[in-house]
Structure formats: C-alpha cells, structure tokens
A protein has these predicted regions:
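Conserved short acidic donor-positioning loop in nucleotide-sugar-dependent glycosyltransferases
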Residues: 92
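Active-site helix of classical SDR
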Residues: 6, 10-13
Length: 159
C-alpha cells in the first residue's frame, strides 16, 4: 500500500467537486513552499536536526523549492485576476534533497561532507516538480528567489 494515496485521492476528489460545483473558484496547488516561520517542512526540520548535531536526510529524491515570498506574489496576482482555474504554484527547477541539505549545512558553517543519506520513507515520490507553464502565462512571474538566497534567509530566521 502507498500511504500517499490517502493524501492524493481525497485531494483530487475535492478539487473535482469544487470545479463542478457551479461556484466561482480558484484552486492553487502549492509545491514545496519554504521560508521563515514555517514548520513541518524539510528545510526547517533539517535545520533543527543540524542544530542538534544530526546531519542526515531520509532519501535523496528531487523536489522543486519555492520561496514563500514568490508564492505570495504569484497568489496575489492569481486571486486578483483569475477564477475557475486550477493552477500549480511553485518553481520548475528540480534539486536533489542532498544538494539542499548541503547548502543548508554550508550556511550553518557545518562541513557538508558530514551528510548521511538514509533510506527514504515508503511511498515517497521520487520526484515532485510542478508544471508551471500556466502560472507563468497568467502571472508573468519568472523572477524567482535563488535557492541559496531563500535558504539563507530561512536558516538565519531559525538560528
């Protein structure tokens, strides 16, 4: 059994219900948004582990990371100008989790060679990267915060 089904199937059913309700709607699917103040996300959880001297990740899948300020700007444009759509908000650039972990370690002054890659969770997607064609067309947004800069701001907020 894949534990992700318990998340993705109800989500898809809910989106379908809303889209067929006859009401005005805007469904925004956020992909790996990170930034200061967030909890329960890889970046924040890894920083906390590093503060405890634990330098490991679970799996080395790929993800696209979107800094919170970028997600807010895209959302603002979408909400003000569009309806009756389902839109992915995120960044197209895919990065291995180990690369992100090593960047975080470098920002924290920890030798990235200390990183240990452990087995990942059962059922975890090997890659998670949105198709951002529609959000770019609708918002014109292309000025993403560079990953290194967003990570630096996030890490500094957690130290």
């Amino acid at each position: 059994q894949n534990p992700r089904w318990s998340y993705s199937v109800p989500k898809a059913l809910g989106e379908n219900l809303v889209a067929n309700s006859g009401l005005e709607y805007l469904i925004i699917r956020y992909f790996n948004v990170y930034g200061p103040g967030q909890i329960d996300h890889f970046v924040n959880e890894f920083v906390e582990r590093c503060k405890q001297g634990e330098y490991y990740i679970k799996g080395d899948d790929t993800r696209s990371f979107c800094y919170v300020d970028d997600a807010v700007r895209m959302t603002d444009i979408l909400v003000r100008n569009h309806s009756n759509l389902t839109v992915n908000v995120g960044q197209q650039e895919e990065v291995k989790i180990s690369v992100v972990a090593k960047l975080i370690m470098g920002i924290m002054g920890v030798n990235p060679d200390k990183l240990e890659v452990r087995s990942g969770p059962v059922g975890s997607a090997k890659r998670r990267c949105p198709d951002t064609t529609l959000v770019k067309q609708l918002t014109g947004f292309t000025d993403y915060t560079p990953l290194q800069e967003g990570l630096r701001k996030t890490v500094e907020s957690l130290l």
